[in-house]
Swiss-Prot record:
Phosphoserine found at: S86
B30.2/SPRY domain segment(s): 282-494
Protein name: Tripartite motif-containing protein 5
Catalytic activity: S-ubiquitinyl-[E2 ubiquitin-conjugating enzyme]-L-cysteine + [acceptor protein]-L-lysine = [E2 ubiquitin-conjugating enzyme]-L-cysteine + N(6)-ubiquitinyl-[acceptor protein]-L-lysine
Gene3D superfamilies named in the record: 2.60.120.920, Classic Zinc Finger, Zinc/RING finger domain, C3HC4 (zinc finger)
Enzyme class per UniProt: transferase
The encoding gene: TRIM5
Length: 494
């Protein structure tokens, strides 16, 4: 009931032009009221006689000067705007909030659902309108496509979110890895500094003891020499102060003694020839450590691959290689044509990794071994290996880039033999201050180099093969030789 009254009141205070509640209502002589903006717009479009215009509703003429603001209607409109619809009215979402009419039309320009009164209002005048049923399917397709696109965008957004989280985790891992490396590097630097300091101080103490001992011995000799000259002077003074007989008695011996007096100069130790530790020596060590750290970035986990040629003893984890008890290895039926073969070749073993490109690094523990050979091999060559004439024929031209130790102290590299002795390798003696207990091997396939590092001596370079001819896949190579102590492939985490 109340809703019906409100609707009737709204109709009375609705502008006949825009069909909306009156805004700043103006009343004409005929009693009709219009919005100020609507009436002004109507004046511009109409062609009245001079000074007179007609009402848009009843066409009765009126004078412009007679137009009056209708404050009473304005107050009613203000009150109506404050009135809320009942719950039943509010639930009618398919009805126009302004006019209460059912929403049956769709304005294409404004893309809004409107009622028939809205369609006739100034706001939608001249717009293209359609029944909601006519455009619903079209917009359903559009919204479905938009939904599909948004779902795809959502998936992409989730993937981007996952990527950034993964990158964040990766960065945290990388930073933690770098922190660990820095701590390890500086710990190693401190260890090197402590070792260098201790070693230099020990050398100085040894030098001091040796030099002072020799100087003391020289001092004793100089004291004895001075005493001998002093005694000869005393004898001469006594003769010169005595009688003629005392002067001439034994004078020949005295003269001979005088002639034989030759002063022996003391042994000296020039200070400018001493080798004193300099900061430059430490710089060399730091440079070596930096190079070792760089190549260790390419550390690969190497294990050995058993084969039917090698007689080496291999551990279950495929990391340790040792030699059987030294003995003559007799022919294994169907494999070797000689009645016995070179023992060193029979204990050689290849790593399981076939290398055809890139940079690779690994370390081998050879502590307590008196003999070993290690490096890189291009694969076994039985025809060359089992020729008894070829004794330890480890030459690059046969696919071996190796170094070795024998008799516990002699470290050698094996190069190609000369034109005069092509069947025997050219052995290059290597100078190492500290015999390596652990050797690092770095292979750069593209640069054609194989480098060996003395890990025991802070990573100093032992030897480097350059201009290597890698015409086929190469493998890590280990040979324990006749020493039964095992050699061990170290894991990257060791």
């Amino acid at each position: 009931m109340a809703s019906g009254i409100l609707v009737n009141v709204k109709e009375e205070v609705t502008c006949p032009i825009c069909l909306e509640l009156l805004t700043q209502p103006l009343s004409l002589d005929c009693g009709h009221s219009f919005c100020q903006a609507c009436l002004t717009a109507n004046h511009k479009t109409s062609m009245p006689d001079e000074g007179e215009r007609s009402c848009p509703v009843c066409r009765i003429s009126y004078q412009h000067k007679n137009i009056q603001p209708n404050r009473h209607v304005a107050n009613i409109v203000e009150k109506l705007r404050e009135v809320k619809l009942s719950p039943e009215e509010g639930q009618k979402v398919d009805h126009c909030a302004r006019h209460g009419e059912k929403l049956l039309l769709f304005c294409q320009e404004d893309r809004k659902v409107i009622c028939w009164l809205c369609e006739r209002s100034q706001e939608h005048r001249g717009h293209h309108t359609f029944l909601t049923e006519e455009v619903a399917q079209e917009y359903q397709v559009k919204l479905q496509a938009a939904l599909q696109m948004l779902r795809q965008k959502q998936q992409e957004a989730e993937e981007l979110e996952a990527d950034i989280r993964e990158e964040k985790a990766s960065w945290k891992t990388q930073i933690q890895y770098d922190k660990t490396n820095i701590l390890a590097d500086f710990e190693q630097l401190r260890h090197i500094l402590d070792w260098v300091e201790s070693n230099e101080l020990q050398n100085l103490e040894k030098e001091e003891k040796d030099v002072l001992k020799r100087l003391m011995r020289s001092e004793i000799e100089m004291v004895q020499q001075t005493q001998s000259v002093r005694e000869l002077i005393s004898d001469l003074e006594h003769r010169l102060q005595g009688s003629v007989m005392e002067l001439l008695q034994g004078v020949d011996g005295v003269i001979k003694r005088m002639k034989n007096v030759t002063l022996k100069k003391p042994e000296t130790f020039p200070k400018n020839r001493r080798r004193v530790f300099r900061a430059a020596d430490l710089k060399v060590m730091l440079e070596v450590l930096r190079e070792l750290r760089d190549v260790r970035r390419y550390w690969v986990d190497v294990t050995v691959a058993p084969n039917n040629i090698s007689y080496a003893v291999i551990s279950e984890d495929m990391r340790q290689v040792s030699s059987p008890e030294p003995q003559i290895i007799f022919e294994a039926q169907g494999t070797i044509s000689q009645t016995f073969v070179n023992f060193n070749y029979c204990t050689g073993i290849l790593g399981s990794q076939s290398i055809t490109s890139g940079k690779h690094y690994w370390e081998v523990d050879v502590s307590k071994k008196s003999a070993w050979i290690l490096g890189v091999c291009a694969g076994f060559q039985p025809d060359a290996m089992y020729n008894i004439e070829q004794n330890e024929n480890y030459q690059p031209k046969y696919g071996y880039w190796v170094i070795g130790l024998e008799e516990g102290v002699k470290c050698n590299a094996f190069q190609d033999g000369s034109i005069h002795t092509p069947s025997a390798p050219f052995i290059v003696p290597l100078s190492v201050n500290i015999c390596p207990d652990r050797v690092g091997v770095f292979l750069d396939y593209e640069a054609c180099t194989v480098s060996f590092f003395n890990i025991t001596n802070h990573g100093f370079l032992i030897y480097k093969f350059s201009h290597c001819s890698f015409s086929q896949p190469v493998f890590p190579y280990l040979n324990p030789r006749k020493c039964t102590v095992p050699m061990t492939l170290c894991s990257p985490s060791s």
